[in-house]
Amino acid sequence: VHWSAEEKQLITGLWGKVNVAECGAEALARLLIVYPWTQRFFASFGNLSSPAAVLANPMVRAHGKKVLTSFGDAVKNMDNIKNTFAQLSELHCDKLHVDPENFRLLGDILIIVLAAHFSKDFTPDCQAAAQKLVRVVAHALARKYH
C-alpha cells in the first residue's frame, strides 16, 4: 500500500487527538450494539443484554481501549501494517475464529466514531485517508484466513 505524504499527515494529525480509551470503548460498544451477533465472541464479558448494559460494561471499555491502542500501532507503522498485525491475525483466525468481516464492520464504526468526535477536522480528505487505513488494517487482520 502506498501512502502519500498528505495521507500520512492527515492520519497522524487526527490520531494525535484521539482518546483511545474513550473512542475505543465507544467503537467496540457500537459494534456490539449495532451488530449483536458479534457479541458471541465476548461471552466472557458478562452482561451484554441491552445497549445500556454494553455501554456500562467495564470489560467492553477495557477491550475497546486495547483494540484502539493496537490500531495506533498501525498509525505508527503505516508502511508495515501487514507485519504489525501478523500475530493478531493468527490469534483471531486460529484461536478465536473471528469472522474476518467483523474487522471491516469495526473499521466502518471507527470511521463513524472519529467523524462524531472530530467533525471539524474530519474533512473528506481526512475521511478518505482514514477509510483507507481501516481497510488496510482489516485486510491485515484477515490475512491469516487466506
From Swiss-Prot:
The yes or no answer to whether the keyword Metal-binding is present is yes
- Tissues expressed in: Red blood cells.
User: Domain of life of the organism in this record?
Assistant: Eukaryota
Q: Which GO terms describe its cellular component?
A: blood microparticle; haptoglobin-hemoglobin complex; hemoglobin complex
Q: Name one GO molecular function term.
A: oxygen carrier activity
Instruction: Tell me the GO BP annotations in alphabetical order.
Output: hydrogen peroxide catabolic process
Where in this chain does the record put each Globin domain? Answer: 2-146
Question: What keywords tag this UniProt record?
Answer: Heme, Iron, Metal-binding, Oxygen transport, Transport
Q: Which residues bind heme b?
A: 63, 92
Against InterPro entries, the record matches this protein to:
Globin, Globin-like_sf, Globin/Proto, Hemoglobin_b, Hemoglobin_oxygen_transport
Assembly description: Heterotetramer of two alpha chains and two beta chains.
Q: What does this protein do?
A: Involved in oxygen transport from the lung to the various peripheral tissues.
PANTHER family the UniProt entry points to: HEMOGLOBIN FAMILY MEMBER (PTHR11442), HEMOGLOBIN SUBUNIT EPSILON (PTHR11442:SF7)
Q: Could you say which protein family the record assigns here?
A: Belongs to the globin family.
Give the protein's recorded name.
Hemoglobin subunit beta
